[in-house]
Amino acid sequence: MKFFTASTLFLLAAQSLNSGVSASLSDPANTPTILADDIVHGYTPATYLSSVPTLLKRATTSYNYNTSSASSSSLTSSSAASSSLTSSSSLASSSTNSTTSASPTSSSLTSSSATSSSLASSSTTSSSLASSSITSSSLASSSITSSSLASSSTTSSSLASSSTNSTTSATPTSSATSSSLSSTAASNSATSSSLASSSLNSTTSATATSSSLSSTAASNSATSSSLASSSLNSTTSATATSSSISSTVSSSTPLTSSNSTTAATSASATSSSAQYNTSSLLPSSTPSSTPLSSANSTTATSASSTPLTSVNSTTTTSASSTPLSSVSSANSTTATSTSSTPLSSVNSTTATSASSTPLTSVNSTTATSASSTPLTSVNSTSATSASSTPLTSANSTTSTSVSSTAPSYNTSSVLPTSSVSSTPLSSANSTTATSASSTPLSSVNSTTATSASSTPLSSVNSTTATSASSTPLTSVNSTTATSASSTPLTSVNSTSATSASSTPLTSANSTTSTSVSSTAPSYNTSSVLPTSSVSSTPLSSANSTTATSASSTPLTSVNSTTATSASSTPFGNSTITSSASGSTGEFTNTNSGNGDVSGSVTTPTSTPLSNSTVAPTSTFTSSGFNTTSGLPTSSASTPLSNSTVAPTSTFTSSGFNTTSGLPTSSASTPSSNSSIVPTSTFTSSGFNTTSGLPTSSASTPLSNSTVAPTSTFTSSGFNTTSGLPTSSVSTPLSNSSAYPSSGSSTFSRLSSTLTSSIIPTETFGSTSGSATGTRPTGSSSQGSVVPTTSTGSSVTSTGTGTTTGVTEVTETSTFETTEIITSTIEPTTASGTGGGNPTAAPTNEPTVTTGTETTEGTATYTEPTTFTSTFSFTTTIIGGTTTIIPVNPGNPSSSVSAPPTTSFTPGPGGSGYPSYSNTTQGMNTTSIWNSSNSTIVSNVTATITGNVTITTGDLTTIDPTTFTSTYLSSGFQTVSNTTATSGSDDDVKTASTSSSTSYTSSSSSSSSTTSAASSKASVSMGLNGLMIAAVILLVA
């Protein structure tokens, strides 16, 4: 054990959650350490925010919204597993009394590897790796099975199909599509991509294949890509596999024959994993597999990625993308899956899940799994689907669930392109079992269930249940089991089923269930924001030897020897569950130092109307001008957020500002972040007799336009004093023989700079809490020290708080007006009489004068925004251990005649950390709270409303503003995000602040980015309750 003074802040490796938050230590001299003791007593991250009266979330932006994001987002799941499972290369079974057994060949694309084909013994019309087989499709050899630095790599791909008393058994062509196994520094790595289908009294059994995973630093790792599907007394069993992480090819397109004996089929297509696009602005959408089936055809199509079921199965193992299962074995000990696709079993010792989409069924009418977009229609000639939204047909025992699609971003636009949060539909007379995003389930009497990267799983009466990210599911004796996360569909009696975004399927009058699993987020290197994805929520439970969680994926184990996943390590064996409601906003700032946010903060405007890619056209008019700043007044146009094309604006106005010489105008207010600025035209007449500038309506676009509008105007009249034309609305200053000929002027916006700062101040109101548990008792005699321990204590604290702030937006514009004037003065003609000959009249030519006048100026205005928020929070800490260690016993011969008392009292004003006292008789004691085995649940919601006040000259307008703050408590770190949006007549402003706050409770500390260690706090108390010292106890 080591003791450190209270001024020492122990920082446990802070992790950046792809949000641009960087960790740094607070100044130990000014930032007191937050003790775990405090945490235990209900002081959530939100509570400690309260102790910082002023959280400066300050930032400025140049308004090109280049918020920085520290997300390099490679979806490579690094598996540090040595001697991981060796997967079987293929599955084959025999066929008897089968009317038709169509076994299209599986072409496996391998490079520099040995290709082994599976054996299909006693199989009628079964060919493996036959070049003449039906619909043999293989993909480009270059992008498949790329094995980097992998020696002794073996890739086998095979396909076998068998059927017993089955009307039809169709196995689509399996190409070891997108079977890109990137194995870095991996020796003895084997990748097998195989396909097997087996059916007993099954109408249809369809399986497809494949997919892959990236493994880093894995030795003796075997990746089983693609597996087998089996069904007992099941009407339909369809599986598909998931495409690999960086696969740009479309995953496998199977075809099935027509005029085949009718059979109810269910197919599932899968999600394509994330793709990376270095130069393209938009992420590529990965059309992962598009199967087709023709009329009256027994269609069994499968695309990419998938899972299956097993009954009394010995083993279910999956290393990368895709699970496998076997029929008729028992007492299996192991099931491990890493990336992509899960599975579950009944009466099996194993249930494993991994990344994308799983599912199983026993005596179930239907069990289908997929990943990304399917579709159905009833008696339709054609069914086409692009993206989300599922449909199911009538009178079928169908269940469909869809979850959200991860948003995608492009480089030039800061706002996300779109994100449709799915909408599942299921039709009448269907028995429905629906599972949404990140919802796991199932296996009975299973000994082990382990999940890793994305994709979950749980069990019944099993020792372990693990859940992760994506969406799996199983069913026992159920009519339907459906899982989804993105969009599915099926078709009944359909001639054609076509899907744009990966996968369709068809079936005729079958009891069908379709499941779709989430699409992995897409990233491109130059994109500022990550595509999506909730950054994990780790869970671990008691008595576990090891529980580590990764970035974006958690895991649990009970009485398990080991449960491991990649990155990020939760503290101790504690179970930490966090949830928060609210919106985190579209932009993230980089927070560093002691709280000052440096980076991009943009301030807010208007409520965005949906995620449209094209903004509607808006028109508005206004007149008048601000005589102080020279900026035009205008009617506010509410720009649409997230549009890639700015609306077109038209406007007219007249009049001129005699002070600044700037034209009055109705301002064209282009949407923020638009790449196209509207073009405006206007005309006016008259001239300013003081400055000699023409009056005009000026196009004054404010905000972030990349192209300034072009303006033209004409005027007439001329001023004889200055030689400038007089306007039609002004009286010439004198009588003269001069008159104007023509005049023209141009107005150009040279530059515009917009800065924004938001300075919220957060204060927390009262907090209250209580501690319960078993009071420890102890005694001491003749110099002995007897520590006592209590367990099961719990603390609950609640509180309210407010957030107020002021946002100021200042814009400075530089403009230039150039005028070209041409003036003509006619000569005077004279005549006279006299003696003799008459005098000839003068013959002078007209005098033409041409001149140019340029006026430059600068205009600045500031727009203040104020807001106030109120929120409440509740924190509950359950479990944990309190140990009281007697310190410096009083009378060595005395004993404790009464048990110590423990109390929990909020600190001064409810904003500090609590005082925690233990008082015994006859001795001083030190109380140590062990946060291991404790559960911390923190929920904080905040709703903020306010107004934006805009003052331009003598005109003041107030626009409604909505702010949303989210406080997420996880472990010993708090992440606070505030987003403000206001409606302005000038531009779109969105202010977003983000801070990461540790458990520091000092009024002088401002949102630091540190993470406090999982430390134990001990407080020494005397008989009189006086605090002697505070220390941090670290267990070496």
Curated annotation (Swiss-Prot):
Top-rank lineage group of the source organism: Eukaryota
What's an example of a GO molecular-function annotation for this chain?
cell adhesion mediator activity
Q: Where is the composition biased (Polar residues)?
A: 586-595, 631-647, 693-709
Q: Which residues form a coiled coil?
A: none
Biological processes, Gene Ontology terms: flocculation
What would be one Gene Ontology cellular-component term for the protein?
A: external side of plasma membrane
Q: Which residues form the propeptide?
A: 1012-1036
Keywords (alphabetical) are:
Cell membrane, Glycoprotein, GPI-anchor, Lipoprotein, Membrane, Signal
DNA-binding listed as a keyword: no
Query: Sugar-bearing residues?
Result: 66, 97, 165, 201, 233, 259, 277, 296, 312, 331, 347, 363, 379, 395, 410, 429, 445, 461, 477, 493, 509, 524, 543, 559, 573, 611, 626, 642, 657, 673, 688, 704, 719, 735, 918, 924, 930, 933, 939, 947, 977
The reply to whether Iron-sulfur figures as a keyword in the UniProt entry is: no
Q: What is this protein called?
A: Putative GPI-anchored protein pfl2
User: Organism, per UniProt?
Assistant: Schizosaccharomyces pombe (strain 972 / ATCC 24843)
